[in-house]
């Protein structure tokens, strides 16, 4: 159990690990070769000193090597948030994923149970009837037949079980809150990634660039790990190897600004009903914010040239019933059936 000690000592002294050192350290963590005290000490030392891009790249590289992969179309996109923003909003990225799928772009969505809200994407999807505990081959079928597949993080990152108890006992954010969305089991190169704090917007864009992503936006919206309609969203966009930073307001999408209360969610059942209501035609603040995120994803995917185009495509996906059809097919295929 001495393998992690030199890395703990280096980080505790205020020094940064190289990419290779970080990979070695996280390989020890995720192979069950460190004690709970060592895991906690290492993670808190990293957090106190501040995680660097090479350290995150090294850690993600190990996670990707150890994950259970899913085969998906090469043009698939992921719409995912780190969670943990503490705002208790409804599942914006889940609804956005269905809208994007309805617009013809395959979505390989990575998600988890709730971190700080009452209901994570997994909770809502389960309430809708989507089966999550399924083989990678079935998830691949979901993506090819329904246009969207949901990958439950616990099932694809079993190596995380070695650090899970220590993370729970620490009870505070660590580097692992950032890693999950960076280790999509389908290996997507296109992504709309929301982060819980604005200081991570540019570093995570740099991380994904160094990991070989092609087209990504990392966003933080006025306290949310999503594009928001409550105020300004900060964006770092990776396009053709270059990162540019900019801000977006609700007006850039042609929607009204709202108070955070309008985006609040509830438990899995509540959020599932709210999501289905929008898919069935209800026009409200939930619809607007999901459309904003879907519009950005459609631009990232190359399906729309502008946000206005993306909003129009997203609205068409909802109003035509295409997004709802994607959900119904996802429910059928995930439960072992065949799409019509």
Curated annotation (Swiss-Prot):
Pfam families noted in UniProt: Glycos_trans_3N (PF02885), Glycos_transf_3 (PF00591)
Q: In which pathway does it act?
A: Amino-acid biosynthesis; L-tryptophan biosynthesis; L-tryptophan from chorismate: step 2/5
Q: Which residues bind Mg(2+) 2?
A: 225-226
Q: Name one GO biological process term.
A: L-tryptophan biosynthetic process
Alphabetical keyword list: Amino-acid biosynthesis, Aromatic amino acid biosynthesis, Glycosyltransferase, Magnesium, Metal-binding, Transferase, Tryptophan biosynthesis
**Cofactor binding note of this UniProt entry:** Binds 2 magnesium ions per monomer.
- What is the superkingdom listed in this entry's lineage? Bacteria
Which residues of this UniProt protein bind anthranilate 1? Answer: 81, 112
Q: Which catalysed reactions does the entry list for this protein?
A: N-(5-phospho-beta-D-ribosyl)anthranilate + diphosphate = 5-phospho-alpha-D-ribose 1-diphosphate + anthranilate
Top-tier EC class = transferase
Binding positions (5-phospho-alpha-D-ribose 1-diphosphate): 81, 84-85, 89, 91-94, 109-117, 121
Q: Output the SUPFAM superfamilies linked to this UniProt entry.
A: Nucleoside phosphorylase/phosphoribosyltransferase catalytic domain (SSF52418), Nucleoside phosphorylase/phosphoribosyltransferase N-terminal domain (SSF47648)
Give the Enzyme Commission number: 2.4.2.18
Please give the cofactor(s) recorded in the UniProt entry for this protein: Mg(2+)
Can you provide one Gene Ontology molecular function annotated for this UniProt record? magnesium ion binding
**A GO cellular-component term linked to this record:** cytosol
Q: For binding Mg(2+) 1, which residues are annotated in this chain's numbering?
A: 93, 226
Question: Family per UniProt?
Answer: Belongs to the anthranilate phosphoribosyltransferase family.
Q: What does this protein do?
A: Catalyzes the transfer of the phosphoribosyl group of 5-phosphorylribose-1-pyrophosphate (PRPP) to anthranilate to yield N-(5'-phosphoribosyl)-anthranilate (PRA).
Oligomeric state and partners? Homodimer.
| Name of the protein in its database record | Anthranilate phosphoribosyltransferase
Q: Which organism was this protein described from?
A: Allorhizobium ampelinum (strain ATCC BAA-846 / DSM 112012 / S4) (Agrobacterium vitis (strain S4))
């Amino acid at each position: 159990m001495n393998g992690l000690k030199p890395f703990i000592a280096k980080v505790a002294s205020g020094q940064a690990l190289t990419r290779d050192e970080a990979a070695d350290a996280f390989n020890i963590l995720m192979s069950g070769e460190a004690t709970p005290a060592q895991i906690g000490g290492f993670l808190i030392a990293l957090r106190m000193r501040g995680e660097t891009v090479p350290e995150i790249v090294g850690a993600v590289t190990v996670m990707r090597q150890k994950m259970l992969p899913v085969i998906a179309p090469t043009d698939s996109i992921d719409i995912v948030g780190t969670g943990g923003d503490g705002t208790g909003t409804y599942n914006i990225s889940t609804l956005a994923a269905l809208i994007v799928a309805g617009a013809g772009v395959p979505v390989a969505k990575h998600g988890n149970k709730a971190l700080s809200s009452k209901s994570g994407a997994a909770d809502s999807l389960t309430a809708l009837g989507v089966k999550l505990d399924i083989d990678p081959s079935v998830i691949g079928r979901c993506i090819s037949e329904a246009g969207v597949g949901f990958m439950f993080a616990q099932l694809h990152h079993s190596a995380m079980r070695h650090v899970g108890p220590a993370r729970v006992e620490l009870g505070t954010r660590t580097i692992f809150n950032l890693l999950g969305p960076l280790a999509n089991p389908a290996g997507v190169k296109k992504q709309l990634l929301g982060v819980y704090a604005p200081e991570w917007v540019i570093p995570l864009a740099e991380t994904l660039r160094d990991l070989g992503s092609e087209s990504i936006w990392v966003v933080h919206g006025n306290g949310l790990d999503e594009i928001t309609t409550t105020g300004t969203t900060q964006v770092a966009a990776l396009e053709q190897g270059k990162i540019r930073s900019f801000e977006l307001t609700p007006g850039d999408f042609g929607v009204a600004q709202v108070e955070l209360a309008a985006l609040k969610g509830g438990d899995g059942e509540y959020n599932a009903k709210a999501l289905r209501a929008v898919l069935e035609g209800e026009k409200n603040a939930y619809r607007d914010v999901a459309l904003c995120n879907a519009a950005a994803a459609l631009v990232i995917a190359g399906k729309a040239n502008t946000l206005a185009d993306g909003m129009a495509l997203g609205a068409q996906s909802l109003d035509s019933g295409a997004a709802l059809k994607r959900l119904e097919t996802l429910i059928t295929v995930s439960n072992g059936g065949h799409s019509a």
